[in-house]
From Swiss-Prot:
InterPro entries in the cross-refs: Endonuclease_7 (IPR004211), Endonuclease_7_sf (IPR038563), His-Me_finger_sf (IPR044925)
Highest taxon, organism lineage: Viruses
Organism: Mycobacterium phage D29
One Pfam family, short name: Endonuclease_7
SUPFAM superfamilies reported for this sequence: His-Me finger endonucleases
Name of the protein: Gene 59 protein
């Protein structure tokens, strides 16, 4: 007799059918009781996803009201006013992850909606210093290296530039 035959069933092999309950939302809606609630939750997978999304939305609305003093309707009005995109980069649209509410840390005034990258790494890193951001614009428009050594293409970019032409 092999080792497997002598082994008693472990906890992973238990029959949990007796512990399953019908989904409470399916029962409330009068749906046929074919979908079991996953142990230990009271809802089937479909209703669990719906409940989780609703709870997430409600907690988000509560958080932006408490943190920034704006309602969900005001958030979406700003979103529409900005064209449904991050105001700085115009790339992020908030479909996968909602845009962040940006505010001035000195005055507390809500300024608009930005993606995480722009809010955290552009404005956050610059600490809202207009002079620093202006220097960055000047740097991009008139690079100091071009003024000193002239336009010189970096070897790591040369192959890419040749293949594009």
């Amino acid at each position: 007799m092999g080792r497997a035959a002598k082994r008693t069933p472990g906890y992973r092999v238990q029959n949990r059918k007796h512990k399953r309950k019908p989904c409470k939302d399916c029962v409330a809606q009068g749906l046929p009781l074919t979908r079991d609630a996953k142990y230990p939750g009271p809802r089937c997978a479909t209703h669990h996803r719906e409940f989780k999304a609703a709870r997430s939305s409600t907690s988000w609305e509560t958080r932006i009201l408490a943190t920034y003093g704006i309602t969900a309707e005001e958030y979406w009005a700003i979103y529409e006013f900005q064209g449904g995109r991050c105001y700085i980069c115009q790339r992020a649209n908030g479909k996968r992850k909602r845009l962040s509410v940006d505010h001035d840390h000195k005055t507390g005034i809500v300024r608009g909606l930005l993606c995480t990258m722009c809010n955290k790494y552009i404005l956050g890193w610059a600490r809202d210093c207009i002079e620093m951001l202006q220097r960055a614009i000047d740097y991009l428009r008139k690079p100091p290296a071009v003024q000193v050594i002239g336009e010189r293409i970096a070897p790591i970019e040369a192959d890419k530039l040749r293949s594009q032409t």
